[in-house]
Swiss-Prot record:
Acts as a Baeyer-Villiger monooxygenase on a broad range of substrates. Catalyzes the insertion of an oxygen atom into a carbon-carbon bond adjacent to a carbonyl, which converts ketones to esters. Active on diverse carbonyl compounds, whereas soft nucleophiles are mostly non- or poorly reactive. In contrast with other forms of FMO it is non- or poorly active on 'classical' substrates such as drugs, pesticides, and dietary components containing soft nucleophilic heteroatoms. Able to oxidize drug molecules bearing a carbonyl group on an aliphatic chain, such as nabumetone and pentoxifylline. GO terms for biological process: lipid metabolic process; regulation of cholesterol metabolic process; xenobiotic metabolic process. Its EC number is 1.14.13.-, 1.14.13.8, 1.6.3.1. This is Flavin-containing monooxygenase 5. InterPro entries: FAD/NAD-bd_sf, Flavin_mOase, Flavin_mOase-like, Flavin_mOase_5, FMO-like. GO terms for cellular component: cytosol; endoplasmic reticulum; endoplasmic reticulum membrane. It comes from Homo sapiens.
Length: 533
C-alpha cells in the first residue's frame, strides 16, 4: 500500500517533531522550510527575516530543560537547566541528526498556496504550490501540517501612540533588537512588559543612561529560579500540585501565588502591581528586573499618552524629556496567507478543535501544530499534537461531528475570555498539564497511575509527585519508549548535574529529613492515587 504523503510547513521545533511523528506512523513527510536551516524562532540571526520571528543575542529560554525536551530524547545532563538560544538550537540539531530528519526537509522552499483538490470531499487531498530558486512546483498531498508558529508578524500598534511620527529619536519593534551596544549613555523607553520587554529593560539598562519601562496594566513577575534553587516550572508542574490547585479553585490559587510572588518583592511598591490576578495573564519571567528597578536603572512608568519630538508624556501627566529611543515590545500576530478560507484568523483568534483541527473541513487532513501559548513549554505540546494529528491522518483516530467540535471550541474560548485579561497576547492560551493530559488521552498515552501504583509503585510515585515532564507520555501506549522509566527516575540527577561544578559536603540532617519525607509520602501514596482518580 502506498504511503500517505504529508506536507509539513516549517522546519522549526514543531516541524521537526511533526516529521518524526509522520515517520513513526508510516507516513511520508515532505517538509518545506523557506530558509536554509532548521530552528525557526531559535536560530539567531543579526538581520531579521520578513515573516519570521527574530530573537536577540542574549535570549535564555524561559522553560527548563526537563519540561521542554522531546519525549524520547532527554536534553544532555550537562546542559544548563535554562539554556541559551545557541544551546537550544544545538539540541534541535542533535534531535534531527539522531532521528535522521533532515533528509525529509526541502530548504529554501517557500509555500505559496495550499488548496483543496476538486475531489477533496472524498480524497481529503491538497494541492501545495511551492517556490524554490524562482521555480514554482505543484504537488498533491494526503495531509498538511502547518508548523509556522505564532511569532510571525511583528505587532506594532503605532496608531495607539499619537505623535510618534514626530519623534526624532529611533523607534522600532523588539524583533529588530539584537544587543545593547547602540544604547550607551541614552535614555530609552521600552513599551510592553511581556518577556521581551522585561528582558530588554534589564539588558539595555546595563549600558543606557536611563531605561523607562512603560506598561498599561502592570504585570506579575515570576522568576526562573524557584525554592531551593530548583527551576520554578519543575516545582509547579506536578500532577499532585495541579490536582490540589484544581480542588482549591482559581481564587485560592491566585491568592497563594500572589503572596509567594510578593514575598520576593512587593509589586505595589515597585509600581508593577496590575488589577488582574496572577493567573489571568501569560507569565512574565525575569529574575533580574527587580534588581534593576531597586537600583534605579529601570523606572516603571504607565502607558504613554503621546510623544513629542524629544519627549514622552504619560497618562498620569508625568513627562520624560530627552528620549533617544523607543522600543515596542508589543508582541506578534499570526496568519496563514498560503491557506485558503478554510482557516481564518480574526484579531489573533482562530477556530480550531483542540487548537489543532479546523472544524469546517469535510475531511480532517489539515492540522495546525504549535499554535498555542501555554503556561509552560510549547515543545512537548507540539509533539503530542503531532502524534495525535498523524493518528487522525492515518485513520486510527476520528474526530467528532462539526457541531460537536464547534461547541467545544466556543466553550474553550469562553473559558479563555473569562480567565484572562483581554489582550492579543491571550487568544491562544492554554494550561500546560491540562493540555498535555487532554492530548495524551486522545493519543492513548496518558499514564495509568492507578495500575502503575500496583505494578511499579516507584515509577507511579514519580509520575504523581514529580514534574510532569514530556517523557511521562512515553511510558505506556503507542510510541512507548523503553528508556522512559529510567529517564523519569533520573530527572533530579539531570537537574543537579550542571550545578555540581564544585564538591560540597551534603548535610546529613538534610539527608535524614529527605528520607523521612520520602517514607511519609510512600505511606500516603495509595490514598493519594485513589483521591486523584
Amino acid at each position: 500500500m502506498t504511503k500517505k504523503r504529508i506536507a509539513v510547513i516549517g522546519g522549526g521545533v514543531s516541524g521537526l517533531s511533526s516529521i518524526k511523528c509522520c515517520v513513526e506512523e508510516g507516513l511520508e513527510p515532505v517538509c518545506f522550510e523557506r530558509t536554509d536551516d532548521i530552528g525557526g524562532l531559535w536560530r539567531f540571526q543579526e538581520n531579521p527575516e520578513e515573516g519570521r520571528a527574530s530573537i536577540y543575542k542574549s535570549v535564555i529560554i524561559n522553560t527548563s530543560k526537563e519540561m521542554m525536551c522531546f519525549s524520547d530524547y532527554p536534553i544532555p545532563d550537562h546542559y544548563p537547566n535554562f539554556m541559551h538560544n545557541a544551546q537550544v538550537l544545538e539540541y534541535f540539531r542533535m534531535y534531527a541528526k539522531e532521528f535522521d530528519l533532515l533528509k525529509y526537509i526541502r530548504f529554501k522552499t517557500t509555500v505559496c498556496s495550499v488548496k483543496k483538490q476538486p475531489d477533496f470531499a472524498t480524497s481529503g487531498q491538497w494541492e501545495v504550490v511551492t517556490e524554490s530558486e524562482g521555480k514554482k512546483e505543484m504537488n498533491v498531498f494526503d495531509g498538511v501540517m502547518v508548523c509556522t508558529g505564532h511569532h510571525t508578524n511583528a505587532h506594532l500598534p503605532l496608531e495607539s501612540f499619537p505623535g510618534i511620527e514626530k519623534f526624532k529619536g529611533q523607534y522600532f519593534h523588539s524583533r529588530d533588537y539584537k544587543n545593547p551596544e547602540g544604547f550607551t549613555g541614552k535614555r530609552v523607553i521600552i513599551i510592553g512588559i511581556g518577556n521581551s520587554g522585561g528582558d530588554l529593560a534589564v539588558e539595555i539598562s546595563q549600558t543606557a543612561k536611563q531605561v523607562f519601562l512603560s506598561t498599561r496594566r502592570g504585570a506579575w513577575i515570576l522568576n526562573r529560579v524557584g525554592d531551593y534553587g530548583y527551576p520554578a516550572d519543575v516545582l509547579f508542574s506536578s500532577r499532585l500540585t495541579h490536582f490540589i490547585w484544581k480542588i482549591c479553585g482559581q481564587s485560592l490559587a491566585n491568592k497563594y501565588l500572589e503572596k509567594k510572588i510578593n514575598q520576593r518583592f512587593d509589586h505595589e511598591m515597585f509600581g508593577l502591581k496590575p488589577k488582574h490576578r496572577a493567573l489571568s495573564q501569560h507569565p512574565t519571567l525575569n529574575d533580574d528586573l527587580p534588581n534593576r528597578i531597586i537600583s534605579g536603572l529601570v523606572k516603571v512608568k504607565g502607558n504613554v499618552k503621546e510623544f513629542t519630538e524629544t519627549a514622552a508624556i504619560f497618562e498620569d501627566g508625568s513627562r520624560e524629556d530627552d528620549i533617544d529611543a523607543v522600543i515596542f515590545a508589543t508582541g506578534y500576530s499570526f496568519d496563514f496567507p498560503f491557506l485558503e478560507d478554510s482557516v481564518k484568523v480574526v484579531k489573533n483568534k482562530i477556530s480550531l478543535y483542540k487548537k489543532v483541527f479546523p472544524p469546517n473541513l469535510e475531511r480532517p487532513t489539515l492540522a495546525i501544530i504549535g499554535l498555542i501559548q501555554p503556561l509552560g513549554a510549547i515543545m512537548p505540546i507540539s509533539e503530542l499534537q503531532g502524534r495525535w494529528a498523524t493518528q487522525v491522518f492515518k485513520g486510527l483516530k476520528t474526530l467528532p461531528s462539526q457541531s460537536e467540535m464547534m461547541a467545544e471550541i466556543s466553550k474553550a474560548q469562553e473559558e479563555i475570555d473569562k480567565r484572562y485579561v483581554e489582550s492579543q497576547r491571550h487568544t491562544i492560551q492554554g494550561d500546560y498539564i491540562d493540555t498535555m493530559e487532554e492530548l495524551a488521552d486522545l493519543v492513548g498515552v496518558r499514564p495509568n497511575l492507578l495500575s502503575l501504583a500496583f505494578t511499579d509503585p516507584k515509577l507511579a510515585l514519580h509520575l504523581l509527585l514529580g514534574p510532569c515532564t514530556p517523557i511521562h507520555y512515553r511510558v505506556q501506549g503507542p510510541g512507548k519508549w523503553d528508556g522512559a522509566r529510567k529517564a523519569i527516575l533520573t530527572t533530579d540527577d539531570r537537574i543537579r548535574k550542571p550545578l555540581m561544578t564544585r564538591v560540597v559536603e551534603r548535610s546529613s540532617s538534610m539527608t535524614s529529613t529527605m528520607t523521612i519525607g520520602k517514607f511519609m509520602l510512600a505511606l500516603a501514596f495509595f490514598a493519594i492515587i485513589i483521591a486523584y482518580f
